[in-house]
Amino acid sequence: MQLSIQHNHVHLIVEADDKRAMASGMQGFQISAAKHLNAAISKGKPGPRRRGTVFPDRYHAEIITSPTQARHALSYVMINRKHREDQHGPASTWKLDWFSSAITFPGWTEYGDEAFLWRGPPTYDPLMVFQPRTWLLREGWKKKSGSISCREVPSKRR
């Protein structure tokens, strides 16, 4: 549903029918990601192709149950870059984190209901994701605080 690639981990917001479906989906994601990352790391290097684990831990799951929690999770995942910059250095001039699915998120304050795909650099290949099926992640998250601004800083004390 939404994702953000960090330096040493990945943030995901996913929907699953139950714990078994979540575990199966996450296992499939980790296997596929490990194969692709190992191939990319090995590309052009002599010797055997890199193999093995890419993710040292399994995953941490948190069940989202309220509109406020859903909005916070969406903001945190898609604007995580600003959270890091707020703690560790100068802010980027990027409005969006190009290493996330933020470019395809339809709930930005700045574009209302009109825009669905922000323009990126000419060589940018956006991370496309499925749109949510559940009411909570499709529209319920807007109930309390409305749409999300790309200028917000997640978890910043106000």
Stretches with model-predicted labels:
Residues M1-H7, A16-R158:
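Short Pro-Cys-Gly-centered "Cys-loop" motif that presents a nucleophilic cysteine in a tight turn
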